[in-house]
Amino acid sequence: MAGFDWFWKALGGKSGRNQKRSVAIVNQVENHAAELDALDDVALAQRAKDLASGGRIDNHAEFLAILGVASQRTLGLKPYPVQSQAVLRLIEGDVVHMATGEGKTLVGAMAATGLGLMGKRVHSITVNDYLAVRDAEWMRPLVEFFGLSVASISEKMDAGERRQAYKAAIVYGPVNEIGFDVLRDQLITRREDAVQHGADVAIIDEADSVLVDEALVPLVLAGNQPGHAPRGKITDVVRSLKENDDYTIDDDRRNVFLTDKGAAKLEQQLGISSLYDDEHVGSTLVQVNLALHAQALLIRDIHYIVRDSKVLLIDASRGRVADLQRWPDGLQAAVEAKEGLAVSEGGKILDTITLQALIGRYPMACGMTGTAVEATDQLRTFYDLHVSVIERNHPLKRFDEADRIYATMAEKNRAIIDEIALLHSTGQPVLVGTHDVAESEELATALRELNIEVSVLNAKNDAEEAQIIAEAGDIGRVTVSTQMAGRGTDIRLGGADEADYDEVVKLGGLAVIGTARHRSQRLDNQLRGRAGRQGDPGLSLFFVSLDDDVVVSGGSGESVSAQPDATGLIDSDRIRDWVGHCQRVTEGQLLEIHSQSWNYNKLLADQRVIIDERRERLLDTALAWEELAQHAPARAAELEDLDQSVREQAARDIMLYHLDYNWSEHLALMDDVRESIHLRAIARETPLDEYHRIAVREFKDLAQRAVDDAVSTFKSVTIDHEGAHLDDEGLARPSATWTYMVSDNPLAGSGNSVISGIGNIFR
């Protein structure tokens, strides 16, 4: 803990003071053990309820002791003092920094149970379906011991199953599914159709992944409507273009530009006079740019894979296949056309919410991760969350070797293979962390050519990968994994049953090898943390080349001289420091992008709150009828013979349709504004100021337009005992909707537009 003293001082000491108080409370827990052990289950549960009555805990030490005794009785797990400390910090609203293997699952369940006993509804948020279902079932005996209900949400559940699950006091669910349910509930016109019940607290597992890495990933609800898919001929013509002759790609390979020669070739083969004529700018040129981006910049097995005749994106922050993600605005269809697959239907975005805004809906949020300290600035700046560092139950014995730096990528890759082969020859288990699917497959192929058996995890199946990663610590195992594969599953030395534990300890424990530095040190530390759990020995080692993305990007514009040996190895502290500098530069770039993006997103998030409140009132009261009757009294008088409930629901359907439609149009408009804000900003205002001015003006117009449109429809639509016949007026809601996550696009440039190279003509 002493190593973090400077850190707590930098934060003004608040977290440090909380830590001292928490430790003092935990030190008293054991004083209650004898008395509580003598109580039967009913009396023990009642004691906890009494302590938490009124929404606050009267005696934290005794309360933690009760949770601990109940855990031992129901799960056979006695929490360590450091786990009880983490429970207390969660209950008080912190993000706790707990190393891998220190028992976060039990900590989260104890905290959720404690908050549930205080009368709060809790969502325990995970990163995937598998962990949500696993943790809910594993921790169920503890939660139900106190008379609380627990359930889980998963992708395959229908609306009825979800509705029932959300009634539980504690709900485990993947963050994307919870967000999608929020969006779907924003389209209901009858309260009983909602699936969610409001929750008071979000406990977020892998908090840095959700709150930082994926914070600005939009969750999208779309309805059926044709989109901007490139025509087949355009795809064929673009495929014939040659790099450098017909188009150029910028140095960081994020943007592609047609040359005059390329434009002329396209115009000739498409039979048009100019791509840049008004009639083609908003249609043909958009489709050409989409096809060109798909062809030149998006690489199979790096940015996406093709499986079962479908394009599946690879999530850059997790290094995993993301079944639910799509690229926006026709790029998905462009890649499908490039691969010769059936082009998926376009759609109109009905609603969208970022994960950051989703978490902001909870009155209280807290979380757990093994790399919270590195994300302290973001957690404090964007969520006002404090980090509490929880000491390890056993001292760390892992050895973190200095980076091995090579001049070229090829030399680095040869060294990685040699090192894995050397470690494997001793029987020491090896876990290799790669950055993408293609790299992991290439590495596995090279190792198999040396007759080394390899397990490859590309995060395609969460349950299967959990079983494989659980065995990664066994003798002689070599496991190659993308960044996030298998998180949430412990790697125990000697295999899942620890049968060969002693022998693996003698070999030095699990060796973790990183094939390159990540864009932030926090991601490196996530990989390092797989070794050395619970005081086990272990090794971590990263290989770096001067050609690696983080070095090229972070060191752009700088030059460095180095003298490699015959193998390409550069053994220089100066170069290691420079690589660290490059990584810090990329971290700063990411933080700046996050900050800029949040400044744009926050106003829309605030406007969403107003829309949500308006929607709630329209759903739950007679406000819709009252307003329409006030604006169109003659029409209201014509409907007096109808049953009151029919009249009110008809008015509700009308008002909600136009509110939802205009909100959807507002989102689309503001997306357009943001894409071209650098052109629309006037000289005396910053782009952000101009964006806010437009957003406020347009939102005011939205509010009035939604009412005016509703009044117009109210006057003209047929309303009878069956309600308002909106379909007859062409006002039907989409017949089909679907949800997806907009990818953290690999092509997003410094302006953070989704496809910055297409620019303001994109739409």
From Swiss-Prot:
Protein name (record): Protein translocase subunit SecA 2
Reaction(s) catalysed (UniProt annotation): ATP + H2O + cellular proteinSide 1 = ADP + phosphate + cellular proteinSide 2
Pfam family, one: SecA_DEAD
Enzyme Commission (EC) number: 7.4.2.8
Quaternary data: Monomer and homodimer. Part of the essential Sec protein translocation apparatus which comprises SecA, SecYEG and auxiliary proteins SecDF. Other proteins may also be involved.
Keywords, in A-Z order: ATP-binding, Cell membrane, Cytoplasm, Membrane, Nucleotide-binding, Protein transport, Translocase, Translocation, Transport
Annotated compartments: Cell membrane; Cytoplasm
Tagged with keyword Protein biosynthesis: no
Membrane topology: Peripheral membrane protein
